[in-house]
Amino acid sequence: MSEIRLDHLNIPARDPVGLAQWYASTFSLSVDRHVVRGPGLIIVFKQGDPIGRAVDDVHMGFRVPSVDALNGWAKKFDGKPIVGPEFTSFRIADPEGNGIELYTPSA
């Protein structure tokens, strides 16, 4: 079986332009016609109401390179990382309420 990778996320947003700008400024991403592009990933924000939360644990995850880097992000968001057996992480929500996890694998 061939390898796969995530290519894009399609996120409903009441204010797609504003949400794209939030992701761009928060995570230092570039914006191209309301499409936020990061390394190998496209996030499309489409006009529309959120579809609701089918499961409370629905979120997107951003991997950071180290615990020090994670602590820097946590400080930016006034978060407190949780240390687990497999990874250290913390969660925030974007302005539309979508869950975001920032994490790094445990050493």
Describe the function of each predicted region:
Residues 14-30, 74:
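Amphipathic alpha-helical segments
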Residues 16, 60-99, 104-107:
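Vicinal oxygen chelate
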Residues 10, 30-34, 85:
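Conserved catalytic-core motifs of GNAT/GCN5-like acyltransferases
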Residues 8, 44, 91:
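Conserved beta-strand positions that form and line the central face of beta-propeller blades
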Residues 27-58, 64, 99-105:
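Conserved short beta-strand elements that form part of the metal-binding/catalytic scaffold
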Residues 5, 54-56, 84:
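Residue-level preference for beta-strand/loop junctions
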Residues 1-18, 58-60, 106:
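N-terminal beta-strand motif that seeds the catalytic metal site of vicinal oxygen chelate
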